[in-house]
């Protein structure tokens, strides 16, 4: 993979300051700065997704074989097979108002959020982010975001990505990536241990919203899922439900 250009701004650190130290209120100064940092009202749109109950985060949470085959250790999880499973009716389907608008209970949200930020479990915990299309978008199909691979299924991302590839050739490909001169704790748009995607060039509102949740800090994730409760966080511990979740998105 290309070395790309050097990166200086620690986005994870900066976006972590979206909320105060206790994670209870927004830091208005940081919010105002971030409005300016991202182009084309991207931060406004992403922030809107986080505040308007349109983003759903599903976490595979089971000692069942899918997790075990992937090496997941659900060490701190008291698995309860009877609760918090996502029923079929709450899974996204094209053209429907999908999902329950309520989260799991507070303890469960906290435990799931911890799994997504725990150094031992975060890279092994399967998760899926789905964004419900809003009215002004042409397609009513739910949008699938894979923040780990820095991928989004929306048209905005596809245009952005193909534009970089086709308009600039090899130079465009190299321009997609950034590296740090030194070791960094910046996880924002990170695709491997040495490489970050150039998030000023390859990004969309859904990826930015997802990265704010999963690539900043635990207090930010808990702010939107537990304090403000504007992002729904569900556990899935049933393979059929997990497959339905995929089948509804992948044609
Ligand atoms: Zn997108």
From Swiss-Prot:
Its main location: nucleus. It comes from the Eukaryota. Coiled coil: none annotated. One of its GO terms (biological process) is DNA recombination. It is found in: Nucleus. Belongs to the SHU2 family. This is Suppressor of hydroxyurea sensitivity protein 2. It comes from Kluyveromyces lactis (strain ATCC 8585 / CBS 2359 / DSM 70799 / NBRC 1267 / NRRL Y-1140 / WM37). The gene is SHU2.
């Amino acid at each position: 993979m290309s070395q790309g250009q050097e990166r200086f701004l620690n986005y994870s650190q900066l976006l972590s300051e979206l909320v105060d130290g206790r994670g209870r209120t927004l830091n208005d100064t940081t919010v105002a700065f971030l409005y300016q940092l991202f182009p084309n009202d991207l931060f406004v749109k992403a922030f809107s997704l986080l505040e308007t109950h349109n983003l759903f985060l599903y976490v595979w949470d089971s000692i069942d074989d899918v997790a075990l085959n992937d090496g997941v250790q659900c060490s701190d999880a008291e698995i309860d097979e009877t609760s918090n499973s996502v029923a079929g009716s709450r899974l996204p389907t094209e053209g429907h108002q999908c999902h329950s608008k309520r989260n799991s209970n507070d303890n469960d949200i906290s435990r799931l959020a911890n799994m997504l930020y725990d150094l031992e479990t975060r890279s092994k915990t399967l998760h899926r982010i789905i964004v419900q299309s809003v009215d002004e978008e042409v397609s009513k199909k739910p949008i699938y975001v894979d923040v780990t691979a820095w991928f989004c299924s929306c048209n905005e991302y596809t245009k952005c990505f193909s534009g970089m590839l086709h308009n600039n050739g090899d130079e465009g490909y190299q321009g997609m990536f950034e590296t740090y001169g030194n070791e960094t704790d910046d996880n924002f748009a990170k695709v491997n241990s040495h490489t970050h995607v150039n998030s000023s060039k390859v990004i969309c509102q859904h990826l930015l919203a997802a990265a704010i949740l999963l690539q900043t800090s635990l207090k930010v994730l808990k702010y939107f899922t537990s304090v403000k409760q504007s992002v729904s966080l569900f556990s899935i511990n049933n393979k059929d439900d997990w497959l339905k979740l995929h089948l509804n998105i992948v044609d």
